[in-house]
């Protein structure tokens, strides 16, 4: 059986048509400011040399720049940096030029409601953990950001909270989920991925299985709140990184491998605050160690682009449909995620097959 056979099933055909409508999205990423109230442990912005650029602060210069990006074919923008909320005029200039996109924010400063982008509000832990992982710029323990986030964005449909798992905060999710759910918001997951410098103590490798269990527990306890799938949990907590499991379509990886750019690797750019970019850092999270990459933003492009790797069985195709459906619900306002097509039983079966394969490989190696 193959793809043509799979889409003869109504539920698979319907889901495929639903996600295919959004295949026109062509993204790039933009650091819009080097200013931030916080210094978070393992923050990717303050890695490498990009934070040392001189900021372009003129909103009209940004407006002209986004016009050129639109002409280049970009239809979706990811605005980040240090903290985008501190440059509201630049956000407005972008939104008025390219109206589809998202903003990564700590949520401490409200973004103008007229800027209709998806807002990804970062959460690093509960009321005890968040101040430990996120300090003020002067080094003092930071705030527990969640109360301020909930107050700033009450009843704001633009918002999705993104909880980043690290090596010690799985249990802290309970408090966060209860508060986010009570406020009527949605939440998705990220997995801490080591920066290239390899200096963060938050690396998660020894806690991947516990993280996966917590993800699934949350999905099943808060199905109306958590935007995630079993396949998301499977691939983002695998012992192998996304790069090792699927390869990577981003220009940074293609350049390192010396392969011919196609698709995303031809168009994606990661711009710095001075409107410059470098091929060697054209990636959604440029200063991540590829060998440890489990980042949710990276997966949105990596897994979604690997359609051919997911059509050799119906189960894999169902998993891929769930993943793309989840990614679209995470990154687009008003996109409603459907029911899981790749069930918990599918997830368990896939993990057992993986274990059996690894065991078989180990036995063969022992014989040799």
Spell out what each predicted region is:
Residues 260-368:
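Flexible mid-to-C-terminal extensions adjoining Fe-S/redox cofactors in radical SAM and related proteins
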Residues 35-47, 247, 285-299:
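Local cysteine-cluster metal-coordination motifs and their immediate loop/turn environment
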Residues 30, 34-37, 242, 277, ...:
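Processing junctions and N-termini across compartments
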Residues 39, 73, 115, 183-188, ...:
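Short loop/turn motifs at secondary-structure junctions
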Residues 92, 117, 121-278, 282, ...:
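Radical SAM enzyme [4Fe-4S]-AdoMet core and its adjacent flexible, acidic
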Residues 48, 82, 124, 192, ...:
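Flexible loop residues that form catalytic
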Residues 2-113, 313-323, 358-361:
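Conserved alpha-helical substructure of the radical SAM core
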């Amino acid at each position: 059986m193959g793809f043509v056979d799979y889409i003869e099933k109504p539920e698979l055909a319907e889901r495929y048509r639903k996600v295919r409508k959004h295949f026109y999205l062509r993204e790039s990423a933009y650091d819009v400011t080097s200013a931030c109230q916080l210094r978070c442990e393992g923050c990717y912005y303050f890695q490498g040399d990009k934070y040392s650029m001189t900021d372009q602060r003129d909103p009209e210069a940004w407006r002209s720049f986004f016009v050129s990006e639109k002409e280049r074919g970009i239809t979706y923008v990811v605005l980040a940096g240090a903290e985008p909320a501190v440059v509201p005029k630049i956000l407005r200039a972008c939104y008025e030029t390219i109206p589809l996109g998202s903003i990564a924010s700590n949520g401490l400063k409200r973004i103008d409601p007229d800027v209709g982008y998806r807002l990804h509000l970062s959460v690093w832990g509960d009321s005890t953990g968040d101040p430990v992982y996120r300090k003020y710029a002067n080094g003092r323990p930071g705030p527990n950001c969640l109360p301020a986030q909930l107050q700033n964005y009450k009843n704001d449909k633009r918002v999705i909270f993104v909880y980043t798992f690290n090596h010690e905060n799985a249990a802290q999710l309970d408090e966060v989920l209860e508060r986010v759910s009570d406020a009527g918001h949605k939440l998705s997951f990220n997995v801490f991925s080591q920066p290239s410098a390899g200096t963060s103590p938050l690396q998660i490798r020894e806690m991947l299985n516990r993280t996966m269990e917590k993800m699934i527990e949350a999905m099943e306890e808060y199905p109306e709140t958590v935007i995630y799938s079993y396949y998301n949990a499977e691939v983002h907590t695998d012992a192998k990184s996304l790069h090792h499991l699927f390869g990577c379509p981003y220009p940074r990886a293609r350049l390192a491998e010396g392969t011919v750019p196609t698709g995303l690797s031809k168009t994606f750019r990661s711009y710095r605050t001075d409107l410059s970019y470098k091929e060697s850092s054209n990636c959604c999270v440029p200063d991540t160690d590829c060998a440890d990459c489990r980042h949710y933003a990276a997966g949105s492009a990596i897994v979604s682009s690997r359609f051919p790797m997911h059509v050799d069985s119906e189960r894999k195709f169902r998993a891929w449909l769930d993943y793309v459906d989840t990614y679209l619900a995470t990154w687009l306002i008003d996109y409603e995620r459907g029911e899981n097509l790749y069930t918990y039983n599918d997830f368990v079966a896939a993990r057992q097959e993986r274990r059996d394969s690894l065991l078989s490989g180990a036995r063969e190696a022992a014989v040799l």
